[in-house]
C-alpha cells in the first residue's frame, strides 16, 4: 500500500499587518539605498489602529522623508480614504532612528581578516552578526520551490490582482491563504487536499457571493486542474465574516512572517528576518546566497532537492561553516558539493554583495509574496547562471 502524507504551507497578502510592516521597512531601506548605496540600515516597523512606529539603527548620508515613505507605502497597498479602518494619509507616524552601534561597526567596517593583515578588499566587511542561514531548492515546480508555498503565494497574488483591477472590487487588502498538498511515498505531489482562503471584504457582500467569486476568479485560475479532485476541501472565509482587518484587526510587526518569506516550513530557517536590513546583515544576504547556491545545484541536475546551510561569526568575513543536505538525491558526494560551493561562490559578505549586486534599491518588491521563487520580478539570487561552473568544478 502506498503511504501518503500531507504538507501545508501558508501565505499572506500585502495588506496583512505584518506584511505592511515589512513593506514599510523595506521601502525605507530602498529610499536610503537610492541616495547612499553604502547605507547601513536596520529598520523595524510596527503598525496598529491609526499608528505606525518606525525604530532602528541607521548609518547613512541619505536624507529621506520617512513620513512620506511610510504614508505612500500604506496607500499603495490599499489603505486609503479611511475605508478599512487604516489610512495612509491620516495615521500617526512616530520615528525613533539611532546610528548603528560603533561596537558593531567596528567588526563590520574592518573584519578580523583585515585586522590580521589580509589585504583582499572583499575581506574588508565582516559579518554583521553571528548566525546560521539556510537556502533550499526542489524540482517539484518550475521555479524550484516547494509546491505548497508556491501555490499559496500565487493565490495571494491573484487575490491582490482581482482586488486592484476591479474584478472583485469589494475585497479588502488583508488576506491569507493556506494549501495542503498530498504526497506519495516518493515525496511526489499527488493532489491538493485542502485550500483555505480568507479575504477581507466590504460589509454589504454576502458570504455566498464571496465564496463563489473567490472560487471562480482565484482558486480555479491558480491551482492546476490536475491537482484538484472531488475530495479536495475548500474553506473560503470559514469564520463567515472578515470586514475588520489590517492593522485595525491585528497589530503588525516587521519580521513576523519569516516562514512565508522563505519556504513555507519545508526547509529549515535560521531565525533571522529579512526586511529593513541592508546587505551587510548576513541574515538577509547569506540567505539569498544560500538560495542562489541551492537553485543552481538543482538546476544543474546535481540533486533533485538540496538544503544549504551557511554560518558566520560577527566581525569575521569568511563563513564559519558551509554544509549541504541532498536528502539522498545527490549525484555527487555532499563533501564534493561543499568544496565546489566554496570555489564557485564567494560567501564573504562583501563577496555576496558583489556577486548578487545587493547595494541597489530592490527590496520593497520582495517584502510581500515571498523572497524566493519569484517569476514576476527579476531577482539576482533566482538566476541559474552558475550551472556550468558547478558542473565544471565537479566534472559532471
From Swiss-Prot:
Mg(2+) binds at residue 18. It is an enzyme of class 2 (transferase). Pathway: Amino-acid biosynthesis; S-adenosyl-L-methionine biosynthesis; S-adenosyl-L-methionine from L-methionine: step 1/1. One of its GO terms (molecular function) is ATP binding. Its EC number is 2.5.1.6. Keywords: ATP-binding, Cytoplasm, Magnesium, Metal-binding, Nucleotide-binding, One-carbon metabolism, Potassium, Transferase. GO terms for biological process: one-carbon metabolic process; S-adenosylmethionine biosynthetic process. One of its GO terms (cellular component) is cytoplasm. Belongs to the AdoMet synthase family. Homotetramer; dimer of dimers. This is S-adenosylmethionine synthase.
